[in-house]
């Protein structure tokens, strides 16, 4: 069922008939827009980075506290990491809730890791600060400025957080992206910045204390701060109580702060205003304009900190987004004429993902078909009214990825000024749809190494294990089909898989049982969602401990199939496929692709509102199908996941926004397709 966005997702699940569109079936925009403009080239200089660090240090000193501060450019190159105080004083625990003794109440995923401890005398304050800085940069663009407080608001089990009987946050699950194990993300350990997007050690952060940085209205990077010792989240990010991390980061961003016109407070989702910051100028204990110069900082206060694989220890200037040196530049060829497309390039300015054919022995997508899929999706994006961009009336800005049935990337392209996070996520989304729509998903999950969960505290390191194959039986029981995930008969979109990955099913009905791919109550958290993280957690832990200097080798490309020794003495990747090579994603924006009823791939879209992402993927595939004479297209309607009614509630397949186009009053544009 293709739903139009006229009720909250939670109510749509309960009142499905009221959500179904009717009327002009298949109506599409026929107007064409001028090519979108390119972005303004701008970059952080060494002087800029020094100023950010100095202002953050001054605020921390004014509060008689210590902080670790990281600065990144727009594509994630780490330009500086500065630690105040001694390493032993910069302890951090990863947790969403703590008991009276300061230990994590939930165990699993990333929950309960406290460092340094006698059993593991290494630090992660640098990694948490880097993750916050990257989040501020990656979730933002010239048209929207999102902070880690914004992230906290849009990834929780209810939106707005704390309001029960509301659907989950629109970007529920996005925190588990941009991982170091991703076969898409880059890494840099050298002295110079390089092409991005660069990896993030802990994915995206939901802990206030990360802000984007701007110069003359152009997004140039982000700053992240860890001072309070807890890497967590704000359960009520819409309140007016700021955190220590947040106020120091706010001071650090002074003079490079986001323009008010694009800050999250100016943007609404589902009628709810987003939050950018809970602190303001009046909350500062220092005057950033009078902060001592970086060169004047006393060495006893702190120092730059080399971080393996991220920062060499010497401050550097950033790359200018849109320049080939950033890894993301305007298309210079003939692949996307008049569409304003941006493409991903390597250090030699060579395309990383030019259109190519699929790897299947028969029926594979051809290079020409992949190129048409990308072009059609870009056409839809350029006509779509953006949900999260200012000024109002701006077009959506997204990244589009096409994969074959085995998850192999066949082509990627982006709109100008698309938020960087959407690149890795669009590929995650496409792979997730292809994977769960395949005939061997169950066998693949059953063959993965045991998932390791760690609790690291003063008592030592405790390790527990779970087989990812456990989720297969739960899935089959939940949907009432013992052949589920073994026969390839159902086409799963990322919206459908997301429905089944929520801690409540139906989504937003607090107290309802969890979906089969979610952790149950008492063990679920933003740091332990279920299968989504469990397929990648071994690789994530390997990287975190390797970067901290705990003796493990760093990860290789590929987030699944890592066998992590139970004593953390070593790790080995036991498979080499790319099925879920950058992990799994569980919020909307992808659909599988079929040829004569046979799965041949998937298309994923990310970067704007989730209904916009959904529509661009679904409608882009539909329009490509028309252009290709029906050679490939969307799943047959009788095989889509919305034919299933697990536990008496129908799954959703795609949900398209009302009146979605800028130059057309067309309604119900996905109906009947």
Model-flagged regions — what are they?
Residues 23-673:
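Flexible, solvent-exposed loop/hinge segments and secondary-structure transition points
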Residues 15-18:
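C-terminal motif of bacterial Sec signal peptides marking the signal peptidase cleavage site
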């Amino acid at each position: 069922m293709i739903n139009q966005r006229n009720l909250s997702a939670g109510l749509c699940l309960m009142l499905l008939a009221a959500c179904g569109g009717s009327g002009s079936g298949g109506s599409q925009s026929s107007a064409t827009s001028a090519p979108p403009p390119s972005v303004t080239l701008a970059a952080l200089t060494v002087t800029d980075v020094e100023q950010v660090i100095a202002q953050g240090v001054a605020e921390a000193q004014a509060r008689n506290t210590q902080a670790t501060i990281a600065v990144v450019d727009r594509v994630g190159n780490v330009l500086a990491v500065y630690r105040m105080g001694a390493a032993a004083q910069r302890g951090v625990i990863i947790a969403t809730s703590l008991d009276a003794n300061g230990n994590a109440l939930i165990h699993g995923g990333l929950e309960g890791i406290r460092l340094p401890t006698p059993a593991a005398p290494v630090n992660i304050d640098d990694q948490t600060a880097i993750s916050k800085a990257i989040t501020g940069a990656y979730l933002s663009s010239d048209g929207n400025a999102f902070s880690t407080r914004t992230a906290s608001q849009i990834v929780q089990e209810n939106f707005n957080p704390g309001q029960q009987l509301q659907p989950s946050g629109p970007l529920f699950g996005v925190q588990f992206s941009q991982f170091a194990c991703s076969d898409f993300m880059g890494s840099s350990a050298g002295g110079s910045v390089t092409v991005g997007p660069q990896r993030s050690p802990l994915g995206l952060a939901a802990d206030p204390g990360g802000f984007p940085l701007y110069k003359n209205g152009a997004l140039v990077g982000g700053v992240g701060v860890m001072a309070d010792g807890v890497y967590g989240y704000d359960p009520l990010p819409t309140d007016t109580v700021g955190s220590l991390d947040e106020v120091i980061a706010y001071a650090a961003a002074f003079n490079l702060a986001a323009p008010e016109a694009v800050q999250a407070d100016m943007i609404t989702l589902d009628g709810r205003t987003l939050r950018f910051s809970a602190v303001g100028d009046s909350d500062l204990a220092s005057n950033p304009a009078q902060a001592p110069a970086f060169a004047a900082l006393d060495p006893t206060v702190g120092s730059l900190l080399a971080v393996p694989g991220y920062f060499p220890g010497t401050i550097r200037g950033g790359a200018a987004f849109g320049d080939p040196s950033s890894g993301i530049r305007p298309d210079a060829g003939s692949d996307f004429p008049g569409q304003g497309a941006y493409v991903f390039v390597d250090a030699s300015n060579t395309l990383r993902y030019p259109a190519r054919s699929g790897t299947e022995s028969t029926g594979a997508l051809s290079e020409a078909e992949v190129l048409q899929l990308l072009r059609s999706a870009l056409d839809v994006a350029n006509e779509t009214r953006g949900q999260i961009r200012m000024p109002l009336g701006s077009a959506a800005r997204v990244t589009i990825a096409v994969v074959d049935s085995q998850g192999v990337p066949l082509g990627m392209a982006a709109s100008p000024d698309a938020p960087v996070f959407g690149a890795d996520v669009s590929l995650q989304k496409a792979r997730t749809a292809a994977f769960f729509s395949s005939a061997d998903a169950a066998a693949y999950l059953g063959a993965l190494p045991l998932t390791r969960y760690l609790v690291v505290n003063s008592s030592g390191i405790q390790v527990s294990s779970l087989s990812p194959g456990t989720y297969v039986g739960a899935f089959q029981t939940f949907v009432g089909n013992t052949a589920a995930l073994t026969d390839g008969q159902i086409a799963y979109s990322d919206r459908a898989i997301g429905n089944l990955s929520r801690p409540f099913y139906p989504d937003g009905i607090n107290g309802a049982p969890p979906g089969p791919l979610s952790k149950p109550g008492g063990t679920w958290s933003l740091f332990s969602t279920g299968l989504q993280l469990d397929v990648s957690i071994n690789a994530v832990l390997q990287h975190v401990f390797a970067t901290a200097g705990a003796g493990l080798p760093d990860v290789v490309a590929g987030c699944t199939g890592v066998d992590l020794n139970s004593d953390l003495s070593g790790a080995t990747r036991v498979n080499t496929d790319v099925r879920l090579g950058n992990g799994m994603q569980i919020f909307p924006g992808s659909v599988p692709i079929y040829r004569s009823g046979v799965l041949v791939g998937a298309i994923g879209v990310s970067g704007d509102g989730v209904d916009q992402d959904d529509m661009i993927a679904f409608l882009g595939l539909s329009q490509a199908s028309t252009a290709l004479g029906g050679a490939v297209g969307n799943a047959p309607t009788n095989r889509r996941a919305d034919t299933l009614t697990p536990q008496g509630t129908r799954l959703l397949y795609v949900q398209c926004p009302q009146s979605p186009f800028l130059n057309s009053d067309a309604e119900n544009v996905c109906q009947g397709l």
